[in-house]
């Protein structure tokens, strides 16, 4: 059954070919995002920041965390502008809004996969992945 355009959640929809064509560009962005997120959640960095913060706002640890935060923000905005949905930074899991038989679904890709080969309903998530073929 076809979903009326007014009820669609996403303006942009990808075909599998379009999504696959973006992977060479998106994969390095996802890797950079994961690295920047790791810097933000690094326990040693947080301990150093906690020790340095009372003196003057954090010094080098504060700068490092600030730079990592800005990098995460910049990369997430770039991915959103590209029309993709980041589902899990650690896994490198992203979804591409798509239309399947007239209804909105997600094409699903995880860092390390050669191509977009799965899809799932908008509310199903990773466990609901089904092969495209």
Q: Language model features by range: what are they?
A:
Residues 1-48:
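Long, hydrophobic N-terminal alpha-helical segment
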Residues 5, 70, 91-93:
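Residue-level detector of functional hotspots within protein domains
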Residues 29-32, 36, 43, 61-71, ...:
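Amphipathic coiled-coil alpha-helices
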Residues 38, 42-45, 49-52, 91-98, ...:
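A sequence-level detector of short, solvent-exposed, charge-rich linear segments
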Residues 49-61:
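A short, surface-exposed helix-loop junction/capping segment
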Residues 77, 81-133:
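Glycine-rich, aromatic-bearing surface loops/beta-hairpins
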